[in-house]
Amino acid sequence: MFIWTSGRTSSSYRQDEKRNIYQKIRDHDLLDKRKTVTALKAGEDRAILLGLAMMVCSIMMYFLLGITLLRSYMQSVWTEEAQCALLNVSITETFNCSFSCGPDCWKLSQYPCLQVYVNLTSSGERLLLYHTEETMKINQKCSYIPKCGNNFEESMSLVSVVMENFRRHQHFPCYSDPEGNQKSVILTKLYSSNVLFHSLFWPTCMMAGGVAIVAMVKLTQYLSLLCERIQRINR
């Protein structure tokens, strides 16, 4: 009887030992699984934050471009590309200007005013040519305005070079107002459709990248939950 009881106790001890080993293995697997899930969740959270940050940055860039470049592009009336022929180019007078010489320091100077009159080939009108849209805003009497500086002779030399270039190339493309409200044309558009496209391209790529990151993380989470449900059903 003693021998039988001892054998039974030894057998029970072995079974308990096996159960403890299996339990330890199972606990170890569960711990590894929890660590993996925690690491994946942390990585997913970082990816979502990155995607949201990219979308917020792109929205801010859209806003800044909208109040600067896009508004100027929409307000520009010189939208029709045309051909201009030079009629007259001359330096008419000088205007006063001011330039910065340091923090809280401004000095007065002068710049020569270059006037260029052209013939618009499509209508035959005699119109004043401006370098860009901003030239008209600075001084409506001048076609080209050099940068205001301390050296007037340098500004005069630059304007003379521009004048000689016009005399050398008397036929050139320009931009006019198709509705005819502006009795002037411009030589170069600061806010063309090409400039607008390149300015909006990178914010759009950033927005698309942010949306793609968030969508991929959400899709991964959905597929993970779906696989877990399928495993539970199969059990």
Curated annotation (Swiss-Prot):
Subcellular location: Membrane
Recorded GO CC terms: voltage-gated potassium channel complex
Alphabetized PANTHER family for the sequence: CALCIUM-ACTIVATED POTASSIUM CHANNEL SUBUNIT BETA (PTHR10258), CALCIUM-ACTIVATED POTASSIUM CHANNEL SUBUNIT BETA-2 (PTHR10258:SF5)
Function (record text): Regulatory subunit of the calcium activated potassium KCNMA1 (maxiK) channel. Modulates the calcium sensitivity and gating kinetics of KCNMA1, thereby contributing to KCNMA1 channel diversity. Acts as a negative regulator that confers rapid and complete inactivation of KCNMA1 channel complex.
Subunit details: Interacts with KCNMA1 tetramer. There are probably 4 molecules of KCMNB2 per KCNMA1 tetramer.
Domain statement: The ball and chain domain mediates the inactivation of KCNMA1. It occludes the conduction pathway of KCNMA1 channels, and comprises the pore-blocking ball domain (residues 1-17) and the chain domain (residues 20-45) linking it to the transmembrane segment. The ball domain is made up of a flexible N-terminus anchored at a well ordered loop-helix motif. The chain domain consists of a 4-turn helix with an unfolded linker at its C-terminus.
Name the UniProt record assigns to this protein: Calcium-activated potassium channel subunit beta-2
